[in-house]
Amino acid sequence: MKYKVLTLCLSAALFAPIAPTMASTDNQADMVLDQVLVLSRHNLRTPIVNTGILTEVTDKKWPDWDAKSGYLTTQGGALEVYMGHYFREWIDQNKLLADELCPTSNEDIYLYTNSLQRTIATAQFFAAGAFPGCKVNIHHQPEIGKMDPVFNPIITNGSPEFKQKALAAMDDYLKGLSLKAGYEELDTVLNIKDSQKCKTDKLCNLDSQKNSFIIEADKEPGVSGPLKIANSAVDAIDLQYYEGFPADQVAWGLVDTPEKWKKLNTLKNAYQETLFTPKIIAKNVAHPILNYIDKGFVSVDKGETAKFIFLVGHDSNIASLMSAMDFKPYQLAQQYEHTPIGGKLVFQRWTDKQTKKDFMKVEYVYQTADQLRDNAYLSLETPPKHVTLELKDCPVDKNGYCSWEDFQKVMAKALEQ
């Protein structure tokens, strides 16, 4: 990655309200990377739902997996080792940490994950790739299998008013989507017309069924109906592809064009976004992780916390945080998921050593669908994909930088309930 220098464009306006300030870049040599916070989705896991309803909506047998439901797979571990290796090369290139074998003190790095097997293991494999042979502490709650409150995207507002507004927001979001083609494609792949559900419950066409949204305090936003079934089915099919199952076992050999993959994943993306990205929901469920990031990265002086902070959670954490912070729409090339397996939001704090001004750059770093399937080695020469992101209230220059002060204001606004 190439980074160019930022110089601050001061606003000409001398009166309130002051608009966010546009940064500008000229000289890369003056830019210093001071601190990085990564919010990562865990890497490749087995399907969370691979029995029950999925066996009832098709007359076919789903492929077997060699690990427990929801666990990181061996390939997922290897993929994260490669991601860690790439990040270490990037860290060394930008001189973020000391030039030594194990820059792994608490002042250098801090790894913190949700307390599930797939998130803890992701951090362990990342550390093995980034800091091989080094002692690296992985911080998490002691009870493995129980969600850490920081990463738990549950509703914390139990008021009837909130529930009413949240349900309406989910309904409005779903109404704005066009999912008919995706449902029809999935009906064909599953051969749902010959399934047990069709014979016993007349569920022969997913698009003809209604969804019912669920908002309850201390629980994740939920939905019952075809969207939930579709999400579970498409998730299982995506994971088969990433894991490297033989082509005739991936969706029984029926998803063989980019157009078909795109259609199916409109359903999975719709599930994630309908449940977790309506603003009223996003700001509520993302508040714990936003607060953690604010106190450990955004609202502290440089040097008070580790230079490289690595958090491992879930797609719901990333989706809700991005909505709460008002990220602009983005596209991830060569991926069908909007929050892909192993994908990472990389928050970078840079300083212009001439002006002494600080800047923020945010990138989505992720493995393409084929990099995941091929278990592709990653390095500076063969990197993962990078997409520079932009926040609505933190305008970026041509090289993707926005002012640190505006970024702090974005975080403060996101934390407002």
Curated annotation (Swiss-Prot):
<dbReference type="InterPro" id="IPR000560">
    <property type="entry name" value="His_Pase_clade-2"/>
</dbReference>
<feature type="signal peptide">
    <location>
        <begin position="1"/>
        <end position="23"/>
    </location>
</feature>
<feature type="binding site">
    <location>
        <position position="45"/>
    </location>
    <ligand>
        <name>substrate</name>
    </ligand>
</feature>
<dbReference type="GO" id="GO:0008877">
    <property type="term" value="F:glucose-1-phosphatase activity"/>
</dbReference>
<comment type="similarity">
    <text>Belongs to the histidine acid phosphatase family.</text>
</comment>
<comment type="subunit">
    <text>Homodimer.</text>
</comment>
<feature type="active site" description="Proton donor">
    <location>
        <position position="315"/>
    </location>
</feature>
<feature type="binding site">
    <location>
        <position position="41"/>
    </location>
    <ligand>
        <name>substrate</name>
    </ligand>
</feature>
<feature type="binding site">
    <location>
        <position position="220"/>
    </location>
    <ligand>
        <name>substrate</name>
    </ligand>
</feature>
<keyword id="KW-0378">Hydrolase</keyword>
<dbReference type="InterPro" id="IPR033379">
    <property type="entry name" value="Acid_Pase_AS"/>
</dbReference>
<keyword id="KW-0574">Periplasm</keyword>
<dbReference type="Pfam" id="PF00328">
    <property type="entry name" value="His_Phos_2"/>
</dbReference>
<dbReference type="InterPro" id="IPR029033">
    <property type="entry name" value="His_PPase_superfam"/>
</dbReference>
<feature type="active site" description="Nucleophile">
    <location>
        <position position="42"/>
    </location>
</feature>
<dbReference type="InterPro" id="IPR050645">
    <property type="entry name" value="Histidine_acid_phosphatase"/>
</dbReference>
<protein>
    <recommendedName>
        <fullName>Glucose-1-phosphatase</fullName>
        <ecNumber>3.1.3.10</ecNumber>
    </recommendedName>
</protein>
<keyword id="KW-0732">Signal</keyword>
<dbReference type="GO" id="GO:0030288">
    <property type="term" value="C:outer membrane-bounded periplasmic space"/>
</dbReference>
<feature type="binding site">
    <location>
        <position position="118"/>
    </location>
    <ligand>
        <name>substrate</name>
    </ligand>
</feature>
